[in-house]
Amino acid sequence: MENQLWQSTLGCCSQYQESPQDAENILFLLLGLIILVNISINVTTVIWHGLQNAIDKMFSRMHQKTAEVQVTECPPKEPQPANVQDVHIHCVLDPVQVKMAQPTQCSSSSTHYFRKHSNDRRSRRRYCYPRGSLQIRQSNQQQSCHSRQQRLRNNRQFSHGYPPFRKQRQSHKASQTRPMPFFDLEDRDSLLEDDQSCPHPKQPRRSRGGLYKPVRLASNAGLWGRQGGILASLPLPSLYLSPEMRRLPKRVEAKSELRLQGFGPHYSQSRICGNVEAEQWASSPPPPRRLLPNPSWVTVGYSPFPSGGHIPYDARDQWRRGTEGCEPPPAFVSRNLRSDAQGYRDHSSSQAHRQNFPSYTHSQPNHSPPQSVGYSSRESHEVRRRAPDWSEAFPSRHPLTTSTSLTALGEASYQRAPTASSGLVIPHSSQRLAEGQISDPTPPATTFVPLSRNPGGNANYQVYDSLELKRQVQENRGRASSLPPPSTSASRPSLHRSRTGKLN
């Protein structure tokens, strides 16, 4: 029994001794597991960073390869760099063309040779022209002997208008020999290229107005190989121009020369009339009196004064001239809204007067220009005396493009009662014809003379200030007091004088 008890006690002690060893082993196992987990985490992080770097390197290499492939594939598809390089070469060669094509002065050898050659050809063909054009050309040759200062002064007067009839050759020479700015040189060369591509015939072509000779520019004489010049081995300078340079605006002189070459009786009536009036203004001495401008004849785009020397016309003369087969240039459209509204207000009162004239009906609004032009019966007779000249200058009829509002405006101003400020008594249109026939058969010619002042600095139009208008009104009043008063006439004021009478 004792042995059994001893063995049992020994077995219990051995059990108590084995239990702490198991606890220590468990702790060691836990520590090992923790260490292993930490090591594995560190290893995984290192591996992940390595994979990330490798992936980034792969993507960067792939992008570089794709970029290289795109760069290698693009050059055969687009040949644009070569064209851009050509345009750049053209732009570099432009200043060479500009420097070589410009004549230094109007007295250069090439210009002198060109003018002498044209004068010789004109003298050889003088017998081919009619008698009227022969006299005109003889007067042209006499006028070409004036000094260069006189030509420059005439060019300043007609720089923005149409050149006159008899000074056609002179204006050609002045526009050819006038030194041009830098941006106009390429236009000269483009015109030269067009001249060589489409050469003019040897004999002068016959237009509707007679014979004329095509005019060439002076830059092609002795420079680009016509006479074996310094640039005979080079092509035309316009070949070096880029499309951007060809789109530059043309110069005004070239357009005016083209207008002169298109001269004929069927070409624009207003242009011919402007040439006639400019010729009368330039050739005749300054007249002793002036005409007041009428704001109902204002050019479109500018108000309220006329832009140049336009001769005013009477409505009766206009109707008679239309029946005879010749008409003055068409009336300019008025943009004076206040006078137009006044014309519409007085339109109802003008119906009774319209019945006195069989030609001014509602079916013919295009043949009645504004009738209030502001001049006396003597001046209307002077305009009437120019009818044969008008019939020679205008063989074909062109209907006037006057609106109905302008017709109503002219008739309303025709019926308007005189104001206190208007001192000039104007007779009725039906009685003016008889008085004009009884009056002096040779009155002095009245020519419209614009002011020499130009306040705006732009030479496209002449501006009338208040002082000049006041002075002209006073002069017209003095002339009206000196003229014999009409016997029985319905007085009517001028539209312009009734408006500007407040200046007195």
Swiss-Prot record:
For bias kind Basic and acidic residues, which ranges apply?
313-324, 378-389, 467-478
Q: Is Heme given among the entry's keywords? A: no
Q: Which UniProt keywords apply?
A: Membrane, Transmembrane, Transmembrane helix
Q: Which domain of life is it from?
A: Eukaryota
Stated membrane topology is: Single-pass membrane protein
Record's GO cellular component terms: membrane
Q: Does the keyword Metal-binding apply?
A: no
Which residue intervals make up region (Disordered)? 103-180, 313-402, 431-504
**Pfam families cross-referenced by the UniProt entry:** Spem1
Concerning InterPro entries, the annotation shows: SPEM1_N
**Places the protein is found:** Membrane
List residues traversing the bilayer: 26-46
Q: Where is the composition biased (Polar residues)?
A: 103-112, 135-147, 349-377
Q: Name the residue ranges with Basic residues bias.
A: 113-128, 494-504
The name this protein carries in UniProt is Uncharacterized protein SPEM2
Origin organism of this chain? Answer: Rattus norvegicus
Its gene is Spem2
